[in-house]
From Swiss-Prot:
It is a peripheral membrane protein. Its EC number is 1.14.19.-. InterPro entries: FA_desaturase_dom (IPR005804), FAS_N (IPR021863), Fatty_acid_desaturase (IPR012171). GO terms for molecular function: oxidoreductase activity, acting on paired donors, with oxidation of a pair of donors resulting in the reduction of molecular oxygen to two molecules of water. It comes from Sesamum indicum. This is Omega-3 fatty acid desaturase, chloroplastic. Its main location: plastid. It is found in: Plastid, Chloroplast membrane. One of its GO terms (biological process) is unsaturated fatty acid biosynthetic process. The gene is FAD7. Belongs to the fatty acid desaturase type 1 family.
């Protein structure tokens, strides 16, 4: 898709050449004299108001929503091509433009799925925080090596659940109150050493450009040129377990290969000037949490702190890397990545994957319902299952039913291992590309 017309969040495809990300609200970079938007209500609680290019109220919610309209001519051309693939009896091509529009998916989702209930959202926060402190109290009380491994798994999962709730605050799906979202988001994310605004802004870039080779932000593919310029040690670390599952803290400080910037520094390429204060606020909160942990180590001892917090923190990082990677990689069929005019918000979003985590689904707030979340991030997590079921008839083969999990999702480790062995880089040329394999890294035949 060449361009998108938005009436809520100003979402646009970023330029093909992206040396310095422009991650602020795209409308702020336009001619201010040409911007005269009034408040609009989309029926899902999201609204904003611009006049002469100046926001009338500050909203810390992650300003990413699905585009409401696309150019009709391009839309019709893509629909016809997709219909030929699906209805013409040919083998399904996941890279073909879909025979439906984003609005078709939206219309299939019940209206109540868009409603945000702050009391219900806060209920999940209270539940998770209570479980976190309860687990820590039980582990500290028994303090034996039968309990500790069980505690580490359970607590790392709960830390990850806290991250997901903070993630919802960043999207604005937690509530319609931006101040409530910001306060709760800072508390939850700072408690697990995540800079709330810094991450929120980069995650916005990810959603705005999902499925784009260069412009996507997290777990995007390496181009062949960048990949071949990596030294052997870096390649091994990136594609050999468990190292990819420990990447998140490094990503916060230095991002992915081929990109520069830090989630902590207000002058990073990730941010635009009007976001500096938010980034500084989050970095201060992160520093305060780190200072609190240092002080706590003098009270209970560094070994006890490592057992109560340090190991669960690392487990949380592994959960985060596992889940976020597998929502965009690891399907048994190779899925496309896009560039240039072949990329569109809809086509990029349809490359995402749902995953089943068994008993963990409810604990981490159904984050596995990822396709609809990526297309419509303003839907609260507690409505995503219903919204997904309603959208499936429209999505057809573009929705890939996740493999049913056992109580614990050990099967996903197989998907992860397979992907790390085969998904190494994409071609430097072409607007629809697929992962290729480096035979020198794995000993496999090049694909």
């Amino acid at each position: 898709m060449a361009s998108w017309v938005l009436s809520e969040c100003g979402l646009r495809p970023l330029p093909r050449v992206y040396p310095k990300p422009r991650t602020g609200h795209p409308l702020l970079n336009s001619n201010p004299t040409k911007l005269r938007f009034s408040r609009t209500d989309l029926g899902n609680g999201s609204s904003f108001c611009l006049s002469s290019g100046i926001l009338r109220e500050k909203n810390w919610a992650l300003r990413v929503s699905a585009p409401l309209r696309v150019l009709q001519v391009e839309e019709e051309e893509e629909n016809k091509e997709g219909e030929r693939v699906i209805n013409g009896g040919e083998e399904f091509d996941p890279g073909a433009p879909p025979p439906f529009k984003l609005s078709d998916i939206r219309e299939a989702i019940p209206k109540h799925c868009w409603v945000k209930d702050p009391w219900r959202s806060m209920g999940y926060v209270v539940r998770d925080v209570a479980v976190v402190f309860g687990l820590a109290a039980v582990a500290a009380y028994f303090n034996n090596w039968v309990v500790w491994p069980l505690y580490w798994f359970a607590q790392s999962t709960m830390f990850w659940a806290l991250f997901v709730l903070g993630h919802d605050c960043g999207h604005g799906s937690f509530s319609n109150d931006p101040k409530l979202n910001s306060v709760v988001g800072h508390i939850l994310h700072s408690s697990i050493l995540v800079p709330y605004h810094g991450w929120r802004i980069s995650h916005r870039t990810h959603h705005q450009n999902h499925g784009h080779v260069e412009n996507d932000e997290s777990w995007h593919p390496l181009s062949e040129k960048i990949y071949k310029n990596l030294d052997t040690a870096t390649k091994k670390l990136r594609f050999t377990l468990p190292f990819p599952l420990l990447a998140y803290p490094i990503y916060l400080w230095s991002r992915s290969p081929g990109k520069q910037g830090s989630h902590f520094h207000p002058d990073s390429d990730l941010f635009v000037p009007n976001e500096k204060k938010d980034v500084i606020t989050s970095t201060v909160c992160w520093t305060a949490m780190l200072a609190l942990l240092v002080g706590l180590s003098f009270v209970i001892g560094p070994v006890q702190l490592l057992k109560l917090y340090g190991i669960p923190y690392l487990g949380n990082v592994m959960w985060l890397d596992l889940v976020t990677y597998l929502h965009h990689h690891g399907h048994e069929d190779k899925l496309p990545w896009y560039r240039g005019k072949e990329w569109s918000y809809l086509r990029g979003g349809l490359t995402t994957l749902d995953r089943d985590y068994g008993w963990i689904n409810n604990i981490h707030h159904d984050i596995g319902t990822h396709v609809i979340h990526h297309l419509f991030p303003q839907i609260p997590h507690y409505h995503l299952i219903e919204a997904t079921e309603a959208a499936k008839p429209v999505l057809g083969k573009y929705y890939r039913e996740p493999k049913k999990s056992a109580p614990l999702p050990f099967h996903l480790l197989g998907d992860l291992t397979r992907s790390l062995k085969r998904d190494h880089y994409v071609s430097d040329v072409g607007d629809v590309v697929y992962y290729q394999t480096d035979p020198q890294l794995t000993g496999a035949e090049k694909s």
